Amino acid sequence: MAGKLTLIVGPMYSGKTTELLSYVEIYRLGRKKTIVFKPSLDNRYGVDCVKTHAGVEVEAIAVEKSADAMKYIKQPVDAVFVDEVQFFDKDLVKIVRQLLDQDVDIFCAGLDMTFKQNPFETTMLLMSLANEIIKKKAVCHICGEYNATLTYKFVQDDSEIDIGGKEKYIAVCRDCYNKVASKND
């Protein structure tokens, strides 16, 4: 029986990593063999852990390229968890497909869109393979409603790959995004 891919997506501050780590906990409580990966590019909370904004953390292996992950995966493994998938190269998709065929469950979390509302390629490719897609939302930083599906970058830097947190980004609903974006055009 093939493994299954669960993909958790949404804007910043929507609880993607929190949900990912809850699945890690479930598998570990069930005495399943797990491994957690993150991109080495994301060192906001350290290099050897995945950490939520609330401070919950799990040990993780930071890899520069998707292919590097395979040398850490020793069979048998029951589940592989990947945070911040938007920062991985698209080779991750081949690796996920290979692991699914080996009956490994995969859980991935990440942004689905850039702050310019462009899709992240690796995330979109994983969506095409996913058995389940969980689309998260956040509280809009501007109007306070629980309807934010977009990330807005408020610093003057046009780079779409730019690691950061509250010093650069906020979660916003579409109405507030359009209002703020039109003021800054």
UniProtKB/Swiss-Prot annotation:
<keyword id="KW-0479">Metal-binding</keyword>
<feature type="binding site">
    <location>
        <position position="176"/>
    </location>
    <ligand>
        <name>Zn(2+)</name>
    </ligand>
</feature>
<dbReference type="GO" id="GO:0008270">
    <property type="term" value="F:zinc ion binding"/>
</dbReference>
<dbReference type="GO" id="GO:0005524">
    <property type="term" value="F:ATP binding"/>
</dbReference>
<feature type="binding site">
    <location>
        <position position="173"/>
    </location>
    <ligand>
        <name>Zn(2+)</name>
    </ligand>
</feature>
<dbReference type="InterPro" id="IPR027417">
    <property type="entry name" value="P-loop_NTPase"/>
</dbReference>
<keyword id="KW-0067">ATP-binding</keyword>
<keyword id="KW-0418">Kinase</keyword>
<dbReference type="InterPro" id="IPR020633">
    <property type="entry name" value="Thymidine_kinase_CS"/>
</dbReference>
<feature type="binding site">
    <location>
        <begin position="83"/>
        <end position="86"/>
    </location>
    <ligand>
        <name>ATP</name>
    </ligand>
</feature>
<dbReference type="GO" id="GO:0046104">
    <property type="term" value="P:thymidine metabolic process"/>
</dbReference>
<keyword id="KW-0237">DNA synthesis</keyword>
<keyword id="KW-0963">Cytoplasm</keyword>
<dbReference type="GO" id="GO:0071897">
    <property type="term" value="P:DNA biosynthetic process"/>
</dbReference>
<keyword id="KW-0547">Nucleotide-binding</keyword>
<dbReference type="InterPro" id="IPR001267">
    <property type="entry name" value="Thymidine_kinase"/>
</dbReference>
<dbReference type="GO" id="GO:0005829">
    <property type="term" value="C:cytosol"/>
</dbReference>
<keyword id="KW-0808">Transferase</keyword>
<comment type="subunit">
    <text>Homotetramer.</text>
</comment>
<dbReference type="Pfam" id="PF00265">
    <property type="entry name" value="TK"/>
</dbReference>
<keyword id="KW-0862">Zinc</keyword>
<feature type="binding site">
    <location>
        <begin position="10"/>
        <end position="17"/>
    </location>
    <ligand>
        <name>ATP</name>
    </ligand>
</feature>
<feature type="binding site">
    <location>
        <position position="143"/>
    </location>
    <ligand>
        <name>Zn(2+)</name>
    </ligand>
</feature>
<protein>
    <recommendedName>
        <fullName>Thymidine kinase</fullName>
        <ecNumber>2.7.1.21</ecNumber>
    </recommendedName>
</protein>
<comment type="similarity">
    <text>Belongs to the thymidine kinase family.</text>
</comment>
<feature type="binding site">
    <location>
        <position position="140"/>
    </location>
    <ligand>
        <name>Zn(2+)</name>
    </ligand>
</feature>
<dbReference type="GO" id="GO:0004797">
    <property type="term" value="F:thymidine kinase activity"/>
</dbReference>
<feature type="active site" description="Proton acceptor">
    <location>
        <position position="84"/>
    </location>
</feature>
